Amino acid sequence: MFITFEGIEGTGKTTQIKKLTAFLEESGHNVDVTLEPGGSRIGKELRKILLNMDSTDITGECELFLYLADRAQHVGQVIKPAVEAGKIIISDRFADSTIVYQGYGRGLDPKLLRELNDVAVSGNWPDLTILLDIDPEIGLKRAMTRNLQENKMQEEGRFEAESLEFHNRVREGYLTWAALNNDRIVVVNADQTPDEIFKEIKAKVVERIKGDFVTNG
């Protein structure tokens, strides 16, 4: 089973992935956790380019193809083998990020981005996507605080440095994309306590796992 987490900066994806991983492992599941960009050896090198503040001159098209390259390697080297081995694999971001950030955020064609991602993922779309939704002003404050505390602003702060207008477009893009793919994407209000958020996530994941067991078992 393949689960992804999506959302603008500062929604608390990392915290919720840790909670979900612990819950699933305690329930007897074999779980792998990964992320984009950077889930493979090659991806780690691409991540340095994509998130670094020195890359502010990168064009939208260049950014797109670097993300697609990262994803193709990630799927082939990490995600597909884990799914085939019967594991639950959880990824912090996946193809929806590219469709939303580069499409709704940068103004590229979402339909074209979907088609390009179809090539990159080679049929390995998530079984379930958790979209953590929050007001961009709140999310950006959280993300900036985190990067400053962890001294990662230079290395990984390029998207946090984007305008509030950009992040508003991304948020609206996520909600639009979720509505178009509501069989797979569930929206969870991230402006709650971590435990309240996880309660909702756990219910959605358990429901999907039971459905997957009935279908395949």
From Swiss-Prot:
NCBIfam families reported in the protein's UniProt record: DTMP_kinase (TIGR00041)
The Swiss-Prot or TrEMBL record describes its family as follows:
Belongs to the thymidylate kinase family.
Positions binding ATP in this chain are 7-14
UniProt cross-references to SUPFAM superfamilies, sorted A to Z: P-loop containing nucleoside triphosphate hydrolases
Q: What is its EC number?
A: 2.7.4.9
Q: Which cysteines bridge via disulfide bonds?
A: none
Pfam families per UniProt: Thymidylate_kin
Q: Does the keyword Lipid metabolism apply?
A: no
What are the protein's UniProt keywords? ATP-binding, Kinase, Nucleotide biosynthesis, Nucleotide-binding, Transferase
Please state what the protein is called. Thymidylate kinase
GO CC annotation terms, alphabetical = cytosol
Q: Which reaction does it catalyse?
A: dTMP + ATP = dTDP + ADP
Give, as one word, the top-level EC class: transferase
GO-annotated molecular function: ATP binding; dTMP kinase activity
Q: Which PROSITE patterns match?
A: THYMIDYLATE_KINASE
